[in-house]
C-alpha cells in the first residue's frame, strides 16, 4: 500500500479469500480505519481466533455462492479447493464488466473454470514450477501440500485453463501469487507460448519487487 501512497484509512473494503497468514497478517492494521471486512463465517472465525485484535473490525459475513452488493459492485464469492477453513474466489461485477480473483486453489473446478471463462479481467494463480519445487529445500510434507488437490496451481495448471479462454471475452489476465522460491518469470513464459490468441492479454505479476510487500504500519 505504501508505494501507492495509501494507508488503512483510505480503504473502504477488504475481501478475504481465506485465513492463511500471508493473506491476513496485516488485517489488524485496519482497526483504526473504516474498512468493512467481507468473509464467510468459517474464515472470519479462524482469523479472529488467531488474531483477537481483529474482532474490533467491522465484519460482513456472507455465504459462499450468495451475491451481495457493495459500493456499486455486485460481488459473488465462490468456493475454491484449498487447505483452509473455507477458501473462496471472487467475481466483482460493475458496468457490465466482470473481474474474477482466483488464487490459492489446488485444482480448477468446474465452478472456478466457469467464472474464469466469463471474466473480462482475471487474476489467476500460477504458483510454482514443479521442477523448482522438487529441487527446493522445502520438506516433503510441504511439497506434497503445495502439489495436492487443496494446495496451489502450478504453471502448467494455469496454462491449461488459459487455453480454454475466449479471447473475445478476456480483456486482461494477470498471473499472480507466484512463489519466490519455487517459480520464476522465465519458467512461466516458457509455457505461455501455447495459449494462442490470448497471449498478448497476459501480464505476469512478478513477486520479485518491493511493491508487492504487505502493508505494515510499524505497530506491534
Task: Give, region by region, the residue ranges found by the protein language model.
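Core dinuclear metal-dependent hydrolase active-site scaffold
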Residues: 2-9, 25, 62-121, 213-220
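Active-site neighborhood of phospho(di)ester-bond hydrolases with catalytic His/Asp-centered motifs
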Residues: 12-22, 38-41, 100-103, 123-125, ...
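Active-site metal-binding motif and surrounding structural segment of the metallo-beta-lactamase
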Residues: 1-39
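Active-site neighborhood of divalent metal-dependent phosphoester bond hydrolases
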Residues: 43-61
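Cap/insert and terminal regions of metallo-dependent hydrolase folds
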Residues: 110-206
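Short, basic/aromatic-enriched C-terminal tail that caps enzymatic domains
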Residues: 198-220
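Metal-dependent catalytic neighborhoods of phosphoester/phosphodiester hydrolases
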Residues: 25-34, 48-50, 183-190
Amino acid at each position: 500500500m505504501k508505494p501507492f501512497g495509501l494507508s488503512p484509512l483510505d480503504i473502504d473494503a477488504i475481501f478475504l479469500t481465506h485465513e492463511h497468514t500471508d493473506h491476513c497478517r496485516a488485517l489488524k492494521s485496519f482497526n483504526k480505519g473504516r474498512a468493512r471486512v467481507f468473509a464467510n463465517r468459517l474464515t472470519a472465525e479462524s482469523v479472529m481466533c488467531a488474531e483477537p485484535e481483529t474482532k474490533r473490525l467491522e465484519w460482513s459475513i456472507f455465504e459462499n455462492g450468495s451475491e451481495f452488493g457493495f459500493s456499486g459492485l455486485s460481488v459473488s464469492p465462490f468456493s475454491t479447493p484449498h487447505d483452509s477453513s473455507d477458501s473462496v474466489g471472487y467475481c466483482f461485477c460493475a458496468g457490465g464488466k466482470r473481474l474474477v480473483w482466483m488464487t490459492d486453489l489446488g485444482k480448477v473446478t468446474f465452478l472456478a473454470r466457469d467464472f474464469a471463462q466469463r471474466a473480462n479481467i482475471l487474476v489467476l494463480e500460477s504458483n510454482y514450477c514443479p521442477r523448482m519445487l522438487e529441487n527446493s529445500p522445502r520438506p516433503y510434507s510441504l511439497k506434497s501440500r503445495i502439489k495436492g488437490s487443496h494446495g496451489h496451481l502450478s504453471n502448467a495448471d494455469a496454462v491449461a485453463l488459459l487455453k480454454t479462454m475466449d479471447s473475445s471475452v478476456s480483456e486482461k489476465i494477470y498471473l499472480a501469487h507466484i512463489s519466490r522460491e519455487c517459480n520464476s518469470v522465465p519458467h512461466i513464459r516458457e509455457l505461455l507460448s501455447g495459449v494462442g490468441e490470448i497471449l498478448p492479454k497476459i501480464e505476469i505479476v512478478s513477486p520479485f519487487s518491493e511493491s508487492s510487500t504487505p502493508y505494515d504500519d510499524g505497530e506491534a
